[in-house]
């Protein structure tokens, strides 16, 4: 359309067996002229504009084929975009803040008498923290809350816990492939969850472990001759892989 760009594609590999996606970017403004081509949106003569972005994939669970059993990502993306533009920027922002604050505001941490320091950037404080071998309660408190922020942002999708990369990546091939290293890193991601009053964030992890258990029964039997119980190797992925790497 005149104010929308749509990108449809799939992950690398055989398109008959890959996750497919649909991304839609839509622009709205009460003034000026909006024009969209195949790959760009141009807004002319406007002082303000709102950009709406939605993305849907065919992934529908670790036990579902992403094509033959995949989610209707095209219809879902179109439906998301259609509903999204019925909300103003302020309404969406307020809805987001309300959702986030309800979770983030449950926990407070005080370590001695941390002093808020907005004059030195965080990266400088990190370097000084390393050089001084600690001694910055403000930075320690900030990092504890930062970990909670990451968990709130990354652990909201059923069956898909926070991975080693996080929610966003600029890379086609994410570091660590965006997978799960289950010998310590996955556990570390979730250490703050219950102690800092975010038990809901563990639900995707619980679902993922259930998928590991289902697949791990076959790995235990086929690799190790174990007929009862299940196992997981040190790496897994969105498909709940349990075989040795």
Residue ranges of predicted features:
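Aromatic-residue-lined binding/catalytic grooves and analogous aromatic/hydrophobic interfacial grooves
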Residues: 1-245
């Amino acid at each position: 359309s005149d104010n929308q760009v749509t990108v449809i594609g799939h992950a690398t590999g055989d398109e008959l067996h890959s996750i497919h996606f649909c991304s839609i970017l839509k622009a709205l403004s009460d003034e000026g002229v909006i024009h969209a081509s195949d790959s760009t949106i141009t807004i002319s003569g406007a002082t303000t504009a709102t950009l709406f972005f939605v993305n849907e994939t065919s992934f529908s669970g670790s036990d579902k084929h992403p094509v033959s059993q995949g989610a209707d990502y095209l219809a879902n993306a179109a439906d998301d975009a259609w509903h999204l533009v019925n909300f103003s920027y302020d309404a969406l922002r307020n809805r987001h803040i309300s959702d986030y604050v309800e979770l983030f505001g449950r926990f407070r941490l005080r370590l001695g008498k941390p002093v808020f320091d907005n004059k030195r950037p965080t990266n400088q404080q990190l370097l000084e923290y390393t050089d001084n071998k600690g001694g910055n309660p403000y930075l320690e408190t900030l990092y504890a809350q930062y970990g909670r922020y990451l968990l709130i942002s990354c652990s909201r999708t059923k069956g898909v816990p926070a991975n080693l990369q996080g929610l966003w990546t600029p890379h086609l091939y994410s570091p660590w492939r965006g997978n799960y290293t289950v010998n310590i890193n996955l556990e570390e991601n979730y250490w703050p969850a219950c102690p800092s009053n975010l038990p809901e964030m563990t639900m995707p992890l619980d679902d993922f472990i259930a998928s590991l258990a289902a697949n791990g029964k076959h790995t235990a039997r086929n690799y190790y001759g174990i007929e009862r119980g299940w196992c997981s190797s040190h790496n897994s992925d969105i498909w709940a892989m349990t075989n040795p790497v």
